[in-house]
Amino acid sequence: MRRIGVIALQGDVSEHISAIEAAGGQAVPVRRAGIIPTCSGIVIPGGESTTISRQLERTGIAAEIKQAAANGTPVLATCAGLVLAAKEIDAGDVKPLGLIDISVGRNAFGPQRESFEAEINVEGFDRPYRAVFIRAPVVLRCGEGVEKLARFGGRTVAVRQGNVIGLAFHPELTGDLRFHKMLLEA
């Protein structure tokens, strides 16, 4: 059974833990340094990217995530996690981890009250995926080697570069475990 570290500083932590376990993995909450090196995969959940960014730096977890990703550990970054995983962010106080060579725009689909669900086609999936967008970011630019996995309204909302998958939406809120299974099978 693969052990997946779910960054548990703020955001959709319990939902990701439930999804990992439902997909057949062992989920462990990561609140301090020293846990990431014991994991075979990482989830960076949604939440508030500025808050999570500060806590990642303060706890030393940011350096461990960067090292693990550089060593090939699979990473699933969702919503605010996508913002954190980016190389560049359009605005704000977020210190990006630089795991994916992308530029990201925060809250690109509007405020919380304009949250929505939509069917999207994802590269490699045999049927549409019901995506939940909550104050979702968008990928503005993709660098060399970044694969666009899905678009919505002409905008890129899912990407992969090597062992890192970034999603603008919340797969942990859908009951559709395909992205969590991708992480476990990577």
From Swiss-Prot:
Lineage: Archaea, Methanobacteriati, Methanobacteriota, Stenosarchaea group, Methanomicrobia
Name by which UniProt lists this protein: Pyridoxal 5'-phosphate synthase subunit PdxT
Quaternary organization: In the presence of PdxS, forms a dodecamer of heterodimers. Only shows activity in the heterodimer.
HAMAP family for this protein: PdxT (MF_01615)
Catalytic reaction list: aldehydo-D-ribose 5-phosphate + D-glyceraldehyde 3-phosphate + L-glutamine = pyridoxal 5'-phosphate + L-glutamate + phosphate + 3 H2O + H(+); L-glutamine + H2O = L-glutamate + NH4(+)
Keywords per UniProt: Glutamine amidotransferase, Hydrolase, Lyase, Pyridoxal phosphate
Purpose: Catalyzes the hydrolysis of glutamine to glutamate and ammonia as part of the biosynthesis of pyridoxal 5'-phosphate. The resulting ammonia molecule is channeled to the active site of PdxS.
GO biological process, one term: pyridoxal phosphate biosynthetic process
Membership in a protein family: Belongs to the glutaminase PdxT/SNO family.
